[in-house]
Regions:
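Helix-loop-beta element that forms the nucleotide-linked donor phosphate-binding surface
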Residues: 172-190
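Short, polar loop motifs at secondary-structure junctions
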Residues: 68, 168-172
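A short beta-strand/loop micro-motif in the catalytic core of glycosyltransferases
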Residues: 161-168
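Hydrophobic alpha-helical positions that pack around
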Residues: 189-191, 195-197
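Short, well-ordered alpha-helical microsegments
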Residues: 46, 172-173, 194
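Short, structured coil segments at secondary-structure junctions
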Residues: 128, 160, 179-182
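Aromatic- and Gly/Pro-rich donor/ligand-binding loops
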Residues: 11-156, 190
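N-terminal Sec-pathway targeting helices
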Residues: 2-11
Length: 197
């Protein structure tokens, strides 16, 4: 009887460790493209909230951004896994991640001509064979301000996305009208978690 119990415990431990090992091997890496435009701690909070939620769901997220200030870098390095892009998004390679995701915030507001299409619409990954998502994109204003040229380029880039969502009800109608895509309305990432203060 004791021998059978020892064998049972040994089998249980082997199965348990195999399951843990398999889960580690199958954990999906997500490259999360983040908007960073100067001294904005709000961006860091959104990035941290998304990182926390993705970890909770069993993913292996990496926060990817440009134009970070040193205090933002310190915050993100302390609480997340982050990657700072120095020159341009071509530093990211197709096989590095299983998924790419545009994080929430005003990612569809044209702050930067240099990075607008890469941050908001993953232009650098246009021809990649990878799942691409937009979570909780914001236009940053109530009236549509993108040019016809921006609409054409963005609409073409969004064709290759697996999922598109926005965080403003008004953006649902604007995106439907101008891009011909019906996005899902979602919460801001900071509202997805319960934090103990």
């Amino acid at each position: 009887m004791k021998k059978n119990l020892k064998i049972f415990k040994l089998i249980f431990l082997i199965i348990f460790f195999l399951l843990i090992f398999f889960k580690i091997l199958t954990k999906k890496k997500i490259g999360v493209i983040c908007l960073n435009h100067g001294q904005n701690i709000g961006n860091c909070l959104i990035d941290y909230a998304m990182f926390t939620k993705l970890k909770e769901l069993g993913y292996d997220p990496y926060m990817i951004g440009t134009n970070y200030k040193q205090r933002e870098i310190n915050f993100l390095k302390k609480y997340t896994k982050c990657r700072i892009i120095k020159n341009n998004f071509s530093e990211i390679k197709e096989k590095e991640y299983d998924y790419l995701m545009v994080n929430s915030d005003q990612t569809w507001r044209k702050f930067s001509k240099r990075y607008f299409y890469d941050i908001g619409f993953l232009k650098f990954a246009k021809n990649w064979n990878i799942h691409k998502f937009v979570y909780g994109a914001s236009l940053g204003y109530s009236k549509w301000k993108l040019t016809k040229k921006d609409e054409i380029i963005a609409k073409d880039l969004l064709k290759n996305f697996t999922g598109i969502s926005v965080r403003e009800i008004g953006a649902v109608n604007s995106v439907s009208k101008h891009f011909g895509i019906k996005p899902i309305f979602v919460l801001d990432p900071t509202l997805l978690n319960i934090f103990n203060l």
